[in-house]
Amino acid sequence: AYLDFLRAWLKDKAYVALAYMTGILPVKKYGSHSALNMFTEYSMTNPREMAEYFGFTEEEVKELCEKYKRCFEEAQAWYDGYELVAVEAEKKRTYSMYSPKSVVDAMLSGIFDNYWNQTETYEALKIYIQMNFDGLKDSVIRMLAGDLIPINIGTFSNDMTTFQSKDDVLTLLVHLGYLSYRWTDKTVAIPNKEVAQEYINAISSMDWNEVIHSVEASKKLLEALWNMDGETVANGIDKVHQEIYILEYNDENSLSCTIHLAFYFAREYYTVIRELPTGKGFADVCFIPRKSYADKPAVVIELKWDKEAEGAIKQINDKNYVAALKEYHGNLLLAGINYDKKTKKHSCKIEKLKL
């Protein structure tokens, strides 16, 4: 009824020169069309030429960090991750967008923390991610592990009650800010450390015990890595693989998902990079210490599928993966991790280098 009122009030009326409306969601659809098709819509999935105004841009955050003497790298880890694309003169321009309220709170307080729950509550997120749609739980777990999930945003009805599939739920989470949408490849991801904490808060009060156990155990697993305790690392990865049923292996990519979830706590100290470019290929996983944690060792992890962990270490050395970390002057750990199909066990070999 309200949409009918707006349409009758605004559509094709001579007395309306311009109407400007704001809201969290795009206008409700009737079938595949907007109920108010006289509006041009700007949204998180299609910001058009307004992309740079959806939040703070990276340059604006850098200026704020300089003004308030805050660490930009920490601001990036906590509040970046939203990728908005505008098309200017037939050229795509991508903006890294930051959550404004959280950035302001961090600048004024000097503390990088989760300010999300001052305006939203994880209870709202919890309602959506535990809906009974095929593949929804799997997608959330994979995104916690750092995966990008393909999505079709075209079926979303632009409301908070009508859902036909997991894609509709995930599209809503994009509009609510719980996911970042990559327009270039039509995928979604959890944008940053702040929002990831909201997922953990929500899951901790649900029956996803296997995920919470893995996240809680990841702190000790990271310590075992630092201590070069390959056996403990291998056993910890075994446990994550056994507990989380979606992590079925068929290649090194699926092994990578397990590793990222097993070392979830690494994000507390590191920028975690998948497939870091090197002189002779790509290192599978790299942990690069943020400036605030420069005392932590950098880590290069090479993954093998049904081979030998020692062979992974050899590949790191042969392909000179460490060259990509030449600007890091602390300790460097090399970790080779292999999964044996016959024994269904992981093995881990860890070596230490001084750059």
Predicted segments, located by residue:
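Short secondary-structure junctions
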Residues: 263-271, 327-329
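Switch/connector loops and helix/strand junctions flanking conserved nucleotide-binding motifs
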Residues: 28-34, 309-312, 342-349
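Conserved catalytic cores of phosphodiester-cleaving nucleases, focusing on short active-site segments
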Residues: 259, 283-287, 296-307, 319
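Active-site metal-binding core of divalent-cation-utilizing nuclease and nuclease-like domains
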Residues: 267-294
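Conserved catalytic network of the ASCE P-loop NTPase/AAA+ motor domain
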Residues: 11-16, 291-293, 327
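Basic, amphipathic alpha-helical patches used to engage nucleic acids or provide basic targeting signals
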Residues: 309-329
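Phosphate-binding site recognition
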Residues: 1-249, 266-269
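Domain-level recognition of nuclease-like catalytic cores that cleave nucleotide substrates
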Residues: 324, 328-355
